[in-house]
Amino acid sequence: MKVYFYHTQNIQYCLRRMAEGEFPSHFLYGACHLADNGVDVVYHRSPKHELSRLKTALYTAWRVLTCRERFDAIYATHYKGLELVVLLRALGLFRKPIVVWHHQPIVKSKSRLRELLGRFFYKGFDRLIFFSQKLVDDSLKAPKADPRKLVVGHWGADLAFYDKIKAELKAEQTSPSHHLTTTPPQHLTTSPSFIATGKEQRDQPTLIEAFNRTGRHLILYIGINPNPNVPNPNLEAVERCKPADNIDVVKICGLLPYEIAREVAKADCVVICCHRTRYTAGLTTVVEALALGLPIICSRNPQIPVDFDRLGCGISVEYGDVEGWQRAVEYISTHPEEARRMGNRGREIAEQMFNDERCAKEVAEVIKEFSL
């Protein structure tokens, strides 16, 4: 069996950096391991330049409909850009099944017309894969959600990629040149370091206020757009909060999973402070921290499929709770052995449930349902 794999990101860029050892495979949602599970892959040729949503949909439809390689189904990380093909499937004009990851719960539209259009559009999907059971449960409240089409997938990190990074750092730390040239900053020698990455729905004011009060060392990565005409709300929120000297703000531009993962691996704890959302904001950071064996402090998002407190791999904090964040940070800082146990437990969870190979196996099982 063979699938046409569609991604909203540039697939060729991802594959090229993967070949260079600088990109984790989980950003391709198990596609790299589908062949190991009996499903071959035709990779979508991403456009060389960013297009408008309509032009992207037209380009994608053209690529799919004119593909010279035979394929049996479409597997996609998102329906954005795939809309025209989905509509053709709903109309019965495209005969191949479509399997898509759905990042938010399906909801009923307040507009009767939009709801009717949505119900028709969703007929074009054969399976929708969700990141958690909570997303499925919330989706089932919407009339257009067909329970026969909804499944839960365990999306997780490329463990080999993070093991390689940890091995690189260990080798660098034991090399003679490292001991001769490296002098750790003073605050790193007296206190554990916390690190915050990611950009979606981040609650910077709560996080910064908590660390301003604790005085603990925080490395805060902020993604920015180099175009001065494009606003950078995350950076603006950070600057308004006036971070204290114990907070290092690092501006980054572009997709840098390898470079950031190296810095995360050096930290003692990963912190994920988010606003209330209807989806799994912060999940990418969660699965990477689990893979690296680091304890996690995270906003209590019921959409995320990891119960940090129950599983013993971290601490959950209510949304906007500055004092709760203070307590969690202090607990990790003053209980290093427990923090290490949390990290080790997180790695076990990654190996058991949240890894790219398991993700690929589950996706392959869904796709093979249409092989008969």
Question: How would you describe each model-predicted region?
Answer:
Residues 49, 97-112, 127:
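A short, histidine- and acid-enriched strand-loop-helix "catalytic/donor-clamping" loop
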Residues 65-69, 109-128:
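Membrane-proximal helix-turn-helix segments that form the acceptor-binding/catalytic region
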Residues 126-140, 145-164, 168, 173, ...:
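Donor nucleotide-sugar binding/catalytic pocket of nucleotide-sugar-dependent glycosyltransferases
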Residues 185-202, 207-221:
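Conserved donor-binding/catalytic core segment of Leloir-type glycosyltransferases
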Residues 191, 222, 230-264:
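Nucleotide-activated donor-binding/catalytic signature segment of Leloir-type glycosyltransferases, i.e.
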Residues 264-279, 294:
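Acidic donor-binding loop of glycosyltransferase active sites
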Residues 310-322, 329-337:
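Conserved acidic donor-binding segment of nucleotide-sugar-dependent glycosyltransferases
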Residues 327, 331, 338-353, 362-365:
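A short, well-ordered alpha-helix in the C-terminal region of glycosyltransferases
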